[in-house]
Amino acid sequence: MYKAFGIVSSSGRNIYVDGMQDYRPIGAFSFLGRYRVIDFPISNMTNSDIDRIQVYINNKPRSVVEHVGTGRHYNINSKSGKLQLLFSEHNNDNDIYNTDISCYLDNMESLSRMYHPYVVIAPSYMVYSIDFDQFLHTHIDSGADVTLLYHAVDNAKEAYLTCNVLGLNRQKGVESIEPNHGNKKNQYVYMDTCVMKTELFISLIKEAKNLSSMYTLTDILNDKCETLDIRGVAHKGFFASITDFPSYYAANMALLNYKSAQELFHDNWPIYTRTNDSCPTQYFNTADVKNSVISNGCQIEGTVENSVIGRGCVIKKGAVVRNSVILAEATVGEGVHVENEVVDKWAKLVHKKEIVSPTEQPGYIRRNDTL
């Protein structure tokens, strides 16, 4: 691979997942039972032989720091590789100033010391698989200044409303990067993933700071569409943008479909995560499990259908869990019916026997809550 280092960026101020983000950033969200969302961009980089990675964190860093740690579990070469956790030194009470550009400026010394000629930037809040080696080769062969990754969708009126979309010409040149206003169903969703020369990246950061304290990297790239050669490359396969509560729930539910899961997980493309040495899940005689993902360390006595169950959960006898995402160490008591819910860590559903939300508007049970 051409020498490139990786940046895993944090979510912007326009992105917020109600309830769950009160406790941790999106990158630290539990995903499909055993993973965290941030495992996907980091694994994509290490599988692509990118072994120098910077992970940027804006706020509530504890969960990300605990999970990512030194990065050893991501198969990073311990001699030549390194994973850095970098923070915004001047986190402002006024959120309009907490941009990715301000975070990069706070860590300009670390950026300036990177000797790699190219940088690959990917978000901590999107789930997909990609070979960044091939992505970088495509960029270099094209002669473009910047190459952006996009995913073509046909439901942009209802989904991806907090994402940006690309305006492309017939040669896949990027003419604009604008918010998705939900007025067209067919759009090219920008995956907040790009590649460029490190020298250009640093110059764009400095120029963005001079133009506006509110500017993001996307803003300055949009300004440069007329003067730089910016091109788009299409992504194929499973793609989820976790930018609000419905999209988090939908992403977990979508991967219960085996065909969708095959588009994300490949035999030769492992998704690394921090291991947890817990015992296998116990299924009792009364257990009835259908089309679900069950993590290690659980005790299942009740019925589980079309659901994702995190590590160490307890589903008591007579309990029914349908179309739900249950995070680690939660308990569903005897005779409790849970449907269309996201249940956060350590919650205990024991007294209220019917906890059901509408299919089109899944509910949320807070962390460490008792119902």
Q: What role is predicted for each listed range?
A:
Residues M1-S10, E199, K209-L371:
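Left-handed beta-helix
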Residues M1-A254, I365:
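Unchanged
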